[in-house]
């Protein structure tokens, strides 16, 4: 998959030295505006939808945003950006921010999405990859971009390219298996904790090791976190899953369209939204988890998952 870092030395690099605020020293730089727009979503759940009715239901359940997806998942084959007609219909139907996905490296799809005035563009490996060698230069767009990552190096390379929000990605198959998401979130958070205890020479060496821009690595050390909003994605299907991601240090969660399968999707979505907002209150989480025994009935975690446990590195 494409993983090429930008070579423009300082273009769009976030420079923040104000506690945990995510800002840009150049207040008139468009990137600071895009990062600020992404920060508005902190503490929320972003729900994948493939119809207007699903978008309305997600909004009524309290989703902070909806991400429009190609509804033909079941056909297999190449997945692309959603039909512009569907995007326009969703935008007319809801008042929450609307996101849409473009294939990795497909800057023309991104141009089309920006012309449709979507609020955010997700350059997504969840759909098909258009360019194996290049990511989109996100500084060329007015719209804030979201990019997936599985570790700190990937996250910082995507930020250097102009990503205003990071999606820590786990399972891509909509099976409801949260294990890979937990692994990747813990890996990223763990690397940041180790980074916090490094001296300047060690930071430089670490930046080379993970192939990340030194200035962003140093910035991450100072902040104690990656310098943009970070959401978790993949296998998050219950209130407990959502609360786990928040307690591990994420700013919010993506909820896949599989949440609409089975009975009472509104109740499931509402419970997940409440869990994100009250992730440290086990009494609220117990209440939100009650009566959801059918929430996972349409999801099939890979049967040999338990046998695999302990066989690989942790």
Swiss-Prot record:
Q: Which family does it belong to?
A: Belongs to the PdxS/SNZ family.
Cite any additional comment in the entry.
Unlike PDX1.1 or PDX1.3, PDX1.2 is unable to interact with PDX2 and restore prototrophy in yeast snz1 mutants.
The listed locations are: Cytoplasm
Instruction: Supply the Gene3D superfamilies for this chain.
Output: Aldolase class I
- What does this gene product do? The protein has no function in the formation of pyridoxal 5'-phosphate.
Q: Which residues carry this modification: N-acetylalanine?
A: 2
Name the GO cellular-component terms: cytosol
Q: Which UniProt keywords apply?
A: Acetylation, Cytoplasm, Pyridoxal phosphate
Which tissues show it?
Answer: Expressed in callus tissues, flowers and roots. Weakly expressed in leaves and stems.
Q: What is this protein called?
A: Pyridoxal 5'-phosphate synthase-like subunit PDX1.2
Question: What is the protein's species of origin?
Answer: Arabidopsis thaliana (Mouse-ear cress)
Q: Which domain of life is it from?
A: Eukaryota
Q: How does it assemble?
A: Homodimer or heterodimer with PDX1.1 or PDX1.3. No interaction with PDX2.
């Amino acid at each position: 998959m494409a993983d090429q870092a930008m070579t423009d030395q300082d273009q769009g690099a976030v420079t923040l030295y104000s506690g945990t605020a995510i800002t840009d020293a150049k207040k008139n730089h468009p990137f600071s505006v895009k990062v600020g727009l992404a920060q508005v979503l902190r503490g929320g759940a972003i729900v994948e939808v493939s119809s207007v009715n699903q978008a309305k239901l997600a909004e009524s359940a309290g989703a902070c945003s909806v991400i429009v997806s190609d509804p033909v998942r079941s056909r297999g084959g190449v997945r692309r950006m959603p039909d512009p007609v569907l995007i326009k219909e969703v935008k007319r139907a809801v008042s929450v921010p609307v996101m849409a996905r473009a294939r990795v490296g497909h800057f023309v799809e991104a141009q089309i999405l920006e012309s449709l005035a979507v609020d955010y563009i997700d350059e997504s490996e969840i759909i098909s990859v258009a360019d194996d060698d290049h990511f989109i230069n996100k500084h060329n767009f007015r719209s804030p971009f979201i990019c997936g990552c599985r570790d700190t190096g990937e996250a910082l390379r995507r930020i250097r390219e102009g990503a205003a929000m990071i999606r820590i990605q786990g399972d891509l198959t909509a099976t409801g298996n949260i294990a890979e998401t937990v692994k990747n979130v813990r890996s990223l958070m763990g690397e940041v904790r180790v980074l916090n205890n490094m001296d300047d020479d060690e930071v430089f060496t670490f930046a080379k090791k993970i192939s990340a821009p030194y200035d962003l690595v140093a910035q991450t050390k100072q902040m104690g976190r990656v310098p943009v909003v970070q959401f978790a994605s993949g296998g998050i299907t219950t209130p407990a899953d959502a609360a786990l991601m928040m307690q591990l240090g994420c700013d919010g969660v993506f909820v896949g369209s599989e949440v609409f399968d089975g009975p009472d999707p509104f109740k499931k979505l509402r419970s997940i939204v409440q869990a994100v907002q009250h992730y440290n209150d086990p009494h609220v989480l117990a209440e939100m988890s009650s009566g959801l025994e059918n929430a996972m009935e349409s999801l099939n975690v890979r049967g040999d998952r338990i046998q695999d446990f302990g066989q690989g590195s942790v």
